Amino acid sequence: MTTQASTGLRHQTVLRDEAIDALLWRDDGIYIDGTFGRGGHSRLILERLGPGGRLIAFDKDPAAITEAGTVEDARFAIEHDSFAHLDAALDARGIGRVAGVLLDLGISSPQIDEGARGFSFRMDGPLDMRMDTTRGITAAQWLAEADERDIARVIRDYGEERFAVQIAKAIVARRRESGTRGPLDRTSELAALVAQAVKTREKGQDPATRTFQALRIHVNQELADLETGLKSAFERLEQGGRLVVISFHSLEDRIVKRFMQALARPEQSAAPEMRRAPLRAHELPAPQLRLLGRVRPSEAEVSANPRSRSAIMRVAERC
């Protein structure tokens, strides 16, 4: 996503040129930017598109929609929605196939750096965490109602946090004190609560990192949206069309990798009995995607933008 080290510094789009180089294989196609953010990728796509090209961008964040309103280009359109609803949006516009889809996953620095959004454990703010602040329940609302086992499951599965059970117990214990202390609805209090529950520290990582990631993913249904969005993106790609996905943690990258490999190497994902049977060449499942590689940020980019360090970009082409 677009990153910004602190208020007032210019936005830095991760793998900006690499992503667009991989995505744009013809300049007159219809392209999708599934996560507009602050528009870093979209603006570069528009710079490189020919007069016959089109770009449709998606974002759930109202702030991103406001930013998209500053793009004055007849070839551009923005959808205030998740890229998971790609099919419906394209159908409404009478569009069948597209030349490429870019998904830049995760959270942007402007979202993290604004305490009022509730994503940051370093700044106090309401425990919100919604990408789309116009709908859905907040992290505070979910924590106030969820079963202790569900809280532990979310923190374990989406945060890969080994102290998930202890953190869930601490949250539920604090919830019992709501009558005298008020609800658990501030990021600073949750961060302090997690720090007390986590028994060991990882070097260079705040103890609340994994819990905040897990709650954000759950509140926004990020992994479910990713799985749905990948399927829709593939189905909409024309022959030769490109799918470019930038992920920032192992849960996202694992989903992307498995999805692409299943379509590029269908014989490996076939049923065990089919893999064991001797098949003629024409009986083998045909690949539907061609893997074009994996890219990491350069040392120079990581030095200039440390938050890009974990980024992995995977590229595939429809056969």
Swiss-Prot record:
Query: GO biological process annotations for this chain's record?
Result: rRNA base methylation
Recorded superkingdom = Bacteria
Q: What is its EC number?
A: 2.1.1.199
Which stretches are transmembrane? none
Looking up InterPro entries in the UniProt record yields: RsmH (IPR002903), SAM-dep_MeTrfase_MraW_recog (IPR023397), SAM-dependent_MTases_sf (IPR029063)
Tell me where in or outside the cell this protein is found. Cytoplasm
Task: Provide the alphabetized UniProt keywords.
Answer: Cytoplasm, Methyltransferase, rRNA processing, S-adenosyl-L-methionine, Transferase
Family, similarity comment: Belongs to the methyltransferase superfamily. RsmH family.
**Role played:** Specifically methylates the N4 position of cytidine in position 1402 (C1402) of 16S rRNA.
Any idea what this protein is called? Answer: Ribosomal RNA small subunit methyltransferase H
Protein species of origin = Ralstonia nicotianae (strain ATCC BAA-1114 / GMI1000)
